A protein has these predicted regions:
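P-loop NTPase motor core
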Residues: 79-125
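Conserved P-loop NTPase mechanochemical-coupling segment
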Residues: 16-17, 105-148, 178-190
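Amphipathic alpha-helical segments of the small helical/lid subdomains adjacent to P-loop NTPase cores
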Residues: 228-234, 242-311
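C-terminal helical "lid" subdomain and adjoining coupling/linker elements of P-loop NTPases
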Residues: 289-350
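Walker A/P-loop-proximal flanking segment of P-loop NTPase domains
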Residues: 10-53, 58-67, 76-84
């Protein structure tokens, strides 16, 4: 919750803040999820799935700052006052972080265009890693440019041959652009993208080989649906989906306890003097409007962190008055997106996977 500086001022409510460093530097209220880091270190190829707007990008950013060797001098600044700041693992700030963001992928109408857009987006992350770690890479320059797979291979080869620290790969929204193909009714192109010799399968084959050879410590992926990994199993059969594992159920989203603590903070700072009756009134409104996620029969109820934070930010801005709009229109579920994934004859697997993912949701107003 704190940055180790004491809670002596009003912390801002961090609506739509996905950068961990910004979260800490600007003193935003942070619901601490760093206690899940040690458990994640038991896996080499974990995948964690949650619905849209559930805090996945902030989790990716937090892990990037934790493992990046170039951020070692900022460890106390960024993690002071958090659980992991008090219980750091031996692996903190030990790796060459390579961070991909597939949510920024631009679609195309044919395979050639998709490949080009994939390369345009994903050549940059390895170049950034080299530049940020120039003290290790010296005068190294890529011999191949414009091909994301080959550049990743070349980087891993250099790591291996020069005994450099391992890479730690993070992929945010790994299924975003393939989901776009499905929702745009481009099934034939989707099939091309996920075939055995496609650029995407080759990309994950390189990662699998790197994990096996010891040049990659971990490849952590977030996404919404498991279907893409189902279709890529021949090339990436080491993936471990953590979505429904009991120990990780609360890694994203806010529990009742976390939400009550958050609400009490907002009332104390932005509506001082609010009575317990006022707390109970607002709490009941929150439960009635935002309660709706349970990812296991034995799991706790969870709130969507982005939707809840939207309400609390508006509530704070109104000095403790209930805002007229309880949900940001930009966050309402894209019904066409769900309909496309669940009604297409050719996407039966998507139907099963998506239904399973949301099987234990209750009545959230998304």
């Amino acid at each position: 919750l704190s940055r180790g500086l004491g809670d002596v001022y009003k912390r801002q409510i961090p609506y739509a803040v996905a950068d961990f460093a910004e979260m800490r530097e600007r003193g935003f209220y942070y619901v601490d999820k760093t206690n899940y880091i040690p458990g994640l270190e038991d896996y080499n190829a974990p995948i964690f799935l949650r619905p849209r707007r559930f805090g996945k990008s902030l989790l990716i950013s937090m892990l990037a700052h934790y493992y990046d060797r170039t951020k070692a001098n900022r460890f106390e600044e960024l993690f002071g006052g958090t659980w992991i700041g008090e219980h750091p693992t031996e692996e903190h700030n030990q790796y060459l972080v390579i961070r991909y963001d597939f949510s920024a992928m631009v679609m195309a109408d044919d395979m050639e265009g998709v490949v080009q857009n994939f390369n345009d987006l994903n050549c940059g992350p390895v170049e950034v890693t080299v530049e940020h770690n120039r003290d290790l890479f010296g005068d190294f320059q890529f011999t191949t440019r414009g091909n994301a797979v080959q550049m990743l291979e070349e980087l891993l080869g250099y790591i291996s041959s020069h005994g450099l620290p391992k890479a730690y790969i993070l992929i945010d929204e790994y299924d975003n652009f393939t989901n776009q193909l499905l929702t745009s009714y481009n099934d034939s192109l989707y099939e091309e993208v996920t075939t055995s010799d496609s650029f995407l399968l080759t990309f994950f084959k390189v990662i699998k080989a790197g994990i096996g050879e010891g040049t990659i410590r971990t490849c952590f992926c977030t996404g919404v649906l498991p279907v893409i990994m189902d279709d890529l199993t021949s090339g990436y059969n080491i993936a471990e989906i953590l979505t429904f594992k009991p120990v990780f159920l609360n890694m994203l989203g806010f529990t009742y306890e976390e939400t009550k603590t958050y609400l009490r903070y907002v009332l104390d700072k932005y509506a001082p003097g609010a009575s317990e009756e006022r707390f109970e009134e607002i709490w009941q409104l929150i439960v009635n409007n935002y309660d709706g996620y349970r990812f296991s029969p034995v799991g706790e109820r969870l709130f969507n962190s982005t939707i809840l934070t939207y309400f609390l930010k508006k509530f704070a801005a109104n000095a403790g008055s209930i805002p007229p709009e309880l949900i940001d229109e930009n966050l309402r579920t894209d019904i066409n997106w769900i309909r496309r994934l669940t009604l297409s004859q050719n996407n039966a697997k998507e139907t099963v996977s998506y239904t399973h993912l949301r099987a234990h949701e209750t009545r959230g107003n998304l």
